Curated annotation (Swiss-Prot):
SUPFAM superfamilies: Glycoside hydrolase/deacetylase. The keyword Transport does not apply. GO terms for biological process: carbohydrate metabolic process. It comes from Brevibacillus brevis (strain 47 / JCM 6285 / NBRC 100599). Keywords: ATP-binding, Hydrolase, Nucleotide-binding. PANTHER family: 5-OXOPROLINASE SUBUNIT A (PTHR30292:SF0), UNCHARACTERIZED PROTEIN YBGL-RELATED (PTHR30292). One of its GO terms (molecular function) is 5-oxoprolinase (ATP-hydrolyzing) activity. It catalyses: 5-oxo-L-proline + ATP + 2 H2O = L-glutamate + ADP + phosphate + H(+). It comes from the Bacteria. Belongs to the LamB/PxpA family. Gene3D superfamilies: Glycoside hydrolase/deacetylase. This is 5-oxoprolinase subunit A. The lineage of its organism: Bacteria, Bacillati, Bacillota, Bacilli, Bacillales.
Length: 254
């Protein structure tokens, strides 16, 4: 029987601004990627999100991003491998302290936004991120775009690596996500999203925007908790996976 993880980015509120449906979405996912205060989030939000995730029995991961609150961490920043290393270690450490203070254990790390996408195609950046995670705790799982430079870097250094796919994004022929700036980057039709997800998990294939069918490894599925229909979609995707005989759990092997 196939097993797949359902993950969601959360803890993105800060100050007076409230984002997402964190409390509600926790009922449907198996792992949570918590913003660490750079692209979103703040100390109070980090603490509260960790508390909610622990209560729900959801695996907790750090979601480090660029220091770009205005751009929500989605704008490319040209940084050196050393700067990327420091950025990731710092943010992992911040969230890990909150997890430990609440009596929990951190499970994984998933880079955010532009940092994630850049690391998918840039070996030096990917290796610096993987090294940062490994040096902090070699038992942490690295979540990265399926088949990317980031997952390769994680595997090379000896990390448990989860190849991630996206429920609501389209793919390019090289296995990367269609940039949000391009047409048809987001799948708005729920049935199309569900069909894509089931096929990626069951068959290990995805149809790209170029009309070419490519292989893909799906260890974890990213869903988003901030859309108008996020909760209904989260419920639908769980039902679809269960209906296809797929176990939903945050379990990964080397």
């Amino acid at each position: 029987m196939k097993t797949v993880d359902l993950n969601c980015d959360m803890g993105e509120s800060f100050g007076a601004y409230q984002l997402g449906n964190d409390q509600e979405i926790l009922s449907y996912i198996t792992s949570a990627n918590v913003a660490c205060g750079f692209h979103a989030g703040d100390p109070a939000t980090m603490r509260k999100t960790v508390q909610m995730a622990l209560k729900a029995g959801v695996a907790i991961g750090a979601h480090p991003g660029f220091a770009d609150l205005v751009g929500f961490g989605r704008r490319n920043m040209e940084i050196s491998p050393e700067e990327a290393y420091d950025l990731v270690v710092y943010q992992i450490g911040a969230l890990q302290a909150f997890v430990r203070a609440e009596g929990g254990v951190m499970h994984h790390v998933k880079p955010h936004g532009a940092l994630y996408n850049m690391a998918a195609t840039r070996p030096a950046l990917a290796e610096s991120i993987a090294l940062a995670i490994y040096k902090v705790n070699p038992e942490l799982v690295l979540y990265g775009l399926a088949g990317s430079e980031l997952t390769r870097a994680g595997e090379k250094i000896g990390l448990i690596t989860a190849h991630e796919v996206f429920a609501d994004r389209t793919y390019q022929q090289d296995g990367t996500l269609t940039p949000r700036s391009q047409p048809n980057a987001i799948i708005s039709d729920q049935q199309q999203s569900l069909q894509q997800v089931i096929r990626m998990v069951s068959d290990g294939r995805v149809l790209t925007q170029q009309g070419v069918d490519i292989p893909i490894r799906a260890d974890s599925i990213c869903i988003h908790g901030d859309g108008a229909h996020a909760l209904a979609f989260a419920q639908s995707i769980r039902e679809a996976l269960s209906g296809a005989g797929i176990t939903i759990a945050a379990r990964f092997a080397r």
